[in-house]
């Protein structure tokens, strides 16, 4: 491991899990996906370390045939990982300073794309993998269906399928059927109105039959790889647009206006756009993630249960089409993926699986439509003895002496207005007082959803004997925080770009200032699992909703009294606390905030915690000025 430490000053290290391999498939599939992306990007700027268990041989020659060709891979044990990586799920990337880590499949894959483009700016097609506004797989799995599908449900479902596959006809994973259904849904892109009108024009010119064939000659501008093997659908508008994007060649702008009957057509009369790739028209990171997973699934199906292929014809067509993307066959070959040639399937699976519209883990709410404001709901709670109630603030006048602290500690360094910086200081006074009174030397403190690091940097400076970890999904925010930390010379701080569920380390205190919506509930849950204290200031109550992990209300006491929709009424009005609103309306908003947070507090108490809901001082420090403080009993 000494060699690794020395090399970290020169390059980044990429750590990948390895448990076993079966029939050319590397487990976990996250590793297969990462290796495939490295091959597709022709990326050799990372030092790759395969992290194996004790039972796995450390002889890399045994793995050579199933890994990327011409890439050096080092085999290490989990005990040899840098300390920061030992606290994260793999894959993970560590920068040369050894205190900045990126963890989780989506975060790591996006980083690989960015670094590959920086190494060769001529490869503009790599940036196109990140999609419109570069947001592909950027949102966490808790709020993004595509991130959840690509990062969690599809890889896990196929891993389980591959483990359990036998000679008996298998049950097709519901996640596969959900993906099939998604491929049948109309495509939504930022300029879909324009494209749908172009498609209508094609259909009108062709007698509402097959699309125009004028694009056939134009398709020759694409690489030879794309021009071979496509069926007649290559003439469609969707495919022309998709493959022009792949070669970073926009369709030439037309100066002629569309005919009047096309311009005046109602949006409801326009034909829908059909999927070319997973998310819609364009080849993105989502396709990269899905390809190794779907390939290994189809290998088993086509070999043993080929009659099952009729259940997902759109997925099979996607699999065939993606092989024609420039560079995919080459990358797959380097990774040992030998593509299948599937029969053309004409049936659709939508009618065979009519119930796939339901999202697992999110129950359909059968409550009747709730009409009215929050008062009936609040009265209903009062009848059950549940009233707005705040615990007293432990020290409302306490404040840090910001004038004597180094400039980089102050939120003023976070590039905000003086008024906002003052309010941020007031918010920090509340959190820092509670945390510093709980913390002991040697404690590990985690600042979840840390943003620019305002909370974590102050705590690291004030508590030099504690280890502080900042966890944030937004890269630029975390980079700004690290810059401030470097100015202060802090040595007791880690930076982890990841969704919080990929942080697996033990800690003593969890902190979150204005974690949005259900992120507050995720922080509290994470702390409860670790039996850590928590200090959270919730935000964005209007975004609270049932997810695959959480159902609201959370506590048994509130569940017995309120329906989900009644709870949502409280959340909606809890967001109405802005200073420009009338005082009475803000008061009701504050009361709704308290009730929503009391539900969170009661749920934590049911898990063996002592919990207080406190109003921060001064109340003007933020419209969202509640603080939930929990300590394990």
From Swiss-Prot:
Domain GST C-terminal: 130-332
Keywords associated with the record: Cytoplasm, Phosphoprotein
GO cellular component, one term: extracellular exosome
Keyword Phosphoprotein set for record: yes
Tissues and organs where the protein is expressed, per its UniProt entry: Widely expressed in cell types relevant to airway function, including airway smooth muscle cells and epithelial cells.
Record's compositionally biased regions (Polar residues): 224-233
Pfam family, one: Methyltransf_32
InterPro entries to which the protein is assigned, alphabetical: Glutathione-S-Trfase_C-like, Glutathione-S-Trfase_C_sf, Methyltranfer_dom, SAM-dependent_MTases_sf
Cellular localization per UniProt: Cytoplasm
Gene Ontology annotations of biological process type: respiratory system development; response to lipopolysaccharide
Residue ranges of the region described as Disordered: 191-233
Top-rank taxon, per record: Eukaryota
Coiled coil: none
Modified residues (Phosphoserine): 233
Similarity comment text for this entry: Belongs to the GSTCD family.
Name listed for the protein in its UniProt record: Glutathione S-transferase C-terminal domain-containing protein
Species of provenance: Homo sapiens (Human)
């Amino acid at each position: 491991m000494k060699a690794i430490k020395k090399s970290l000053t020169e390059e980044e290290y990429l750590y990948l899990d390895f448990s076993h391999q079966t029939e050319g498939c590397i487990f976990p599939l996250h590793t297969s996906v990462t290796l495939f992306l490295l091959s597709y990007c022709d990326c050799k700027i990372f030092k790759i370390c395969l992290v194996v268990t004790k039972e796995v041989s450390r002889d890399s020659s045994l793995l050579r045939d199933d890994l990327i060709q011409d890439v050096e891979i080092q085999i290490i044990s989990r005990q040899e990982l840098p300390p920061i990586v030992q606290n994260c799920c793999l894959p993970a990337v560590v920068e040369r300073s050894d205190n900045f880590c990126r963890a989780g499949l989506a975060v790591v894959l996006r980083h690989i794309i960015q670094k590959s483009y920086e190494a060769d700016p001529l490869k503009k097609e790599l940036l196109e993998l990140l999609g419109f506004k570069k947001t592909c797989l950027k949102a966490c799995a808790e709020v993004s269906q595509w991130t959840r599908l690509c990062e969690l449900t599809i890889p896990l479902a196929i891993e389980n399928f591959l483990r359990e596959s036998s000679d008996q006809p298998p049950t097709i994973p519901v996640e596969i059927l959900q993906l099939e259904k998604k491929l049948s849904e109309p495509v939504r892109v930022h300029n879909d109105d324009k494209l749908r009108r172009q498609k209508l024009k094609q259909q009108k010119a062709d007698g509402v039959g097959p699309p125009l064939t004028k694009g056939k000659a134009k398709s020759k501008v694409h690489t030879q790889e794309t021009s071979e093997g496509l069926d007649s659908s290559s003439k469609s508008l969707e495919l022309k647009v998709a493959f022009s994007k792949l070669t970073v060649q926009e369709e030439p702008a037309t100066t002629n206006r569309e005919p009047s009957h096309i311009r005046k057509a109602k949006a409801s009369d326009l034909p829908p756009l059909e999927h070319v790739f997973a998310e819609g028209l364009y080849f993105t990171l989502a396709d990269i993630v899905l390809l190794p997973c779907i390939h290994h699934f189809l290998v088993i199906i086509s070999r043993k249960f080929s009659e099952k292929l009729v259940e997902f014809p759109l997925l099979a067509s996607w699999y065939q089409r993606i092989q024609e993307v420039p560079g995919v066959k080459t990358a797959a070959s380097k990774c040992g993926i030998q593509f299948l040639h599937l029969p053309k399937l004409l049936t659709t699976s939508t009618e065979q699986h009519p119930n796939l519209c339901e999202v697992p883990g999110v129950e359909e709410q059968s409550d009747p439509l709730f009409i009215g404001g929050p008062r009936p709901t609040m009265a209903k709670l009062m009848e059950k003895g549940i009233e707005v109630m705040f615990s007293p603030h432990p020290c409302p006048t306490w404040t840090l002496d910001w004038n004597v602290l180094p400039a980089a500690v102050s939120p003023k360094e976070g590039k905000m207005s003086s008024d906002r910086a003052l309010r941020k200081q007031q918010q920090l006074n509340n959190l820092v007082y509670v945390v510093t009174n709980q913390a002991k030397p040697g404690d590990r403190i985690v600042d979840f959803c840390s943003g620019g690091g305002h909370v974590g940097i102050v705590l690291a400076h004030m508590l030099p004997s504690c280890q502080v970890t900042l966890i944030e999904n937004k890269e630029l925010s975390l980079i700004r925080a690290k810059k401030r930390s470097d100015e202060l010379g802090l040595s007791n701080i880690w930076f982890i770009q990841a969704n919080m569920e990929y942080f697996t380390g033990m800690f003593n205190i969890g902190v979150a200032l204005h974690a949005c919506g259900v992120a507050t509930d995720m922080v509290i849950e994470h702390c409860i699992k670790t039996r850590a204290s928590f200090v959270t200031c919730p935000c964005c109550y209007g975004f609270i909703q049932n997810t695959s992990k959480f159902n609201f209300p959370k506590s048994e006491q509130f569940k017995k009294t309120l329906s989900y929709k009644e709870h949502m009424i409280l959340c909606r009005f809890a967001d109405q606390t802005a200073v420009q609103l009338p005082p009475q309306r803000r008061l009701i908003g504050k009361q709704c905030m308290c009730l929503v947070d009391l539900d969170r507090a009661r749920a934590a108490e049911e898990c063996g915690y002592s919990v207080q809901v406190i109003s921060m001082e001064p109340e003007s420090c933020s419209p969202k000025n509640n603080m939930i403080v929990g300590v394990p009993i």
